[in-house]
């Protein structure tokens, strides 16, 4: 059974949901576009929790009703009740765990769009080829979710591979899903260039950063040095006759970003500034995380971007996420963007972890009050 404290929190959310529902029918709110959108957004953010709470109550009522029938004089009713209870009782614990997860505080960045950086790591040309496949995997996943993807910068490698690429992904709560992708992705397979049929191991590093608005990060124009150059293709050849590509250097931190995908220098500069703000925002987020908890030094997982988070084993057609001990097969589907189950496994794992940490914090606070 859920503890009284948990039920109290859930009931408070339900009460707030009812208040917001009433507000939406208030003419004063309906006539104010900004306020209406704000109220509707807050209501939508807790609707799933309220729906789950009401379904949980109905489940308990059904269990209680069938348990009462076990004492009925009619043997047929007793048998039907037993069959119903065999179906209902196993649903109680998972429903309670899901409700607890809904109480985990949301990451304030979850609603943000993201910038994704993909870099070939160890493994030479094979790493570049896998980097290109990982990039395509995210593009296909974004398409499945109805998100918009823009290629901001890319550096081509041999055999059609990619040394590094930068993407922006825009849509509904993109960061809440893609934040689990930061880290080292390892691939094990026989490269196309391997004549002996030996399995090679290569790596690709992925960094996912929430986009930062100007209100999040203030950049002093005097701190930014801009260089312009001609855009180059995958083989290094110039593909533009004007200096439209832009490179920005943030002098205080040494961060360098570049964008050459647009024909307009102004558009490239705007996109490069977006990348720079995201990187500076990530640095500030990292500083705050380190200050709160020295053992947590990245967005997710146990450490920084050098953490090996996932292995793609092609000979065994198996993907393993090492952080959450999750395994699945059918790698062709994975590389075609079918990764929602992996992301869901990560989300559930880290939400449960956050809930445990919050519970320990509340228990400690209660002890101090006592």
Swiss-Prot record:
One of its GO terms (cellular component) is cytoplasm. InterPro entries: PCRF, Pep_chain_release_fac_I, Pep_chain_release_fac_I_sf, Prokaryotic/Mito_RF, RF-1. The modification N5-methylglutamine is found at residue 237. The keyword Protein biosynthesis applies. It is found in: Cytoplasm. Methylated by PrmC. Methylation increases the termination efficiency of RF1. Residues 286-311 are annotated as: Disordered. GO terms for molecular function: translation release factor activity, codon specific. Belongs to the prokaryotic/mitochondrial release factor family. This is Peptide chain release factor 1. It comes from Anaeromyxobacter dehalogenans (strain 2CP-1 / ATCC BAA-258). The gene is prfA.
